[in-house]
Amino acid sequence: MDYQVISGSGSGSGSGNGASYWKYLIIIGIYYLTPSIQVIIYNGHDCHYNVKCSHQLGTIKAFNNVISNIFYILFGILYIIIVYKKEVHSNGITPNSGTIGEKSLYYSLGVALILEGLSSAAYHICPSRLNFQFDTTFMIMGILLSILTLYDKRHTDRIMAAFKFYIIVFFVITLNILALTSPGRLWFWAAMFLLCSYLMIFGSIYLYYGKEYDLDIISYNALITKLKTLSDNKMDQPRFILLVLLNIFTLGSCIYAAVSPPDFTGWILIVSLVNMIIYFIHYLILKYINGETLYHSIKFAMFIDTLLLIAALYFYIDAATNIFLPLVESDTMGKSCVLFGYFDNHDVWHILSASALFIFMNILLFLDEDINDIITETIVVF
């Protein structure tokens, strides 16, 4: 396989384009959560609680659903500490070795997990269809940051500027709001299909050709002109297969959504998650193809993480409420407490999913420890 080598131009210490990621994220979190809490508190007439396991504290009717989000916050803080410790330790390692990577992106993952805990806690003050967007925004953002972090490991010189990334996130949030105000509207999902197609074409070309293609080229005529000038290298088969898989899934999801409009928030969350999983598996396969390996601790962590994810999804699917049903129908789904006589199924989902996310973020952090002693310029890019 004819791959390029990693460019040594990245810093890996928080400078450059990635340095502002966590700073922007904190600012976004403050300005997003503040009005969100106001909306949730003053929109308390349609709240869906598990009537068989709701423990009130003050004016909060289901405090157990709120406090169980503390695990996201604690794991986020712990992860930031781990990243800091690793960064300090890395300063003593031979320079210009291993994958470079922007440490700022890892700090952003920790911040995103903390913000997910805060936003989910706020949402559970009054769980409803309208408020559901607040429960998933930072989950989606964390998934997108994970994809970017994995990509950045071997493409540090091509890291997207923070403001461009958050502009994309802004459009996702805007679409989420439009979907809430126009549920099931054909025009919305038709527009989504066109947008998906547009992003798939330009995104695929950018990911395939790399630095030869400028991300700022967004018009069709400019695209055709630029493609004619690109080098005609031998096909990068692994990358081509990855893009085919991603495009098949994403296009299929867009067609399904246009034909049978689902809930947009859940839809975009699933599409983002599956894209991340496909890319992660692709990364692992190419590590092995190129003679790299994984430490046994990483393999064990991946095994445990898979079990936690499966268990978390079980408790999430076995729901005790449904915010998309009328309140009376949702109340009939109530289930008894399952943990310590205090926490219900959804609380267990919070605990298990927070644990799974924490382990996965650590896997991302330590994934390439096996090549720490290899000169950066000799590490293949994929």
Model region roles, listed by residue range:
Residues M1-F382:
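Long, hydrophobic alpha-helical transmembrane bundles and adjoining juxtamembrane helices/loops
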